């Protein structure tokens, strides 16, 4: 997801998306541990999405807008 797409969501949607991404990351890590994950780069992409969401939530909390 791009930061623009994330910024267009409200806080409730972002929190829901954050929980979904965390569950996805957990599942990807399990698949990787079992050797079933075909594309390990998905773990890194998911972690970056989580960081983007958290950053935007924190910006809103502090009243910062880029």
Curated annotation (Swiss-Prot):
GO terms for molecular function: structural constituent of ribosome. Keywords: Ribonucleoprotein, Ribosomal protein. GO terms for biological process: translation. It holds the Pfam family Ribosomal_L29. CDD domains: Ribosomal_L29_HIP. It comes from the Bacteria. GO terms for cellular component: cytosolic large ribosomal subunit. Signal peptide: none annotated. SUPFAM superfamilies: Ribosomal protein L29 (L29p) (SSF46561). InterPro entries: Ribosomal_protein_uL29, Ribosomal_uL29, Ribosomal_uL29_sf. Belongs to the universal ribosomal protein uL29 family. HAMAP family: Ribosomal_uL29. This is Large ribosomal subunit protein uL29. It comes from Fervidobacterium nodosum (strain ATCC 35602 / DSM 5306 / Rt17-B1). The lineage of its organism: Bacteria, Thermotogati, Thermotogota, Thermotogae, Thermotogales.
């Amino acid at each position: 997801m791009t930061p623009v797409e994330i910024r267009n969501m409200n806080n409730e949607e972002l929190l829901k998306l954050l929980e979904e991404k965390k569950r996805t990351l957990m599942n990807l890590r399990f698949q990787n541990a079992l050797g079933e994950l075909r594309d390990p780069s998905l773990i890194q992409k998911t972690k970056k999405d989580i960081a983007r969401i958290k950053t935007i939530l924190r910006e809103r909390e502090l009243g910062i807008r880029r």
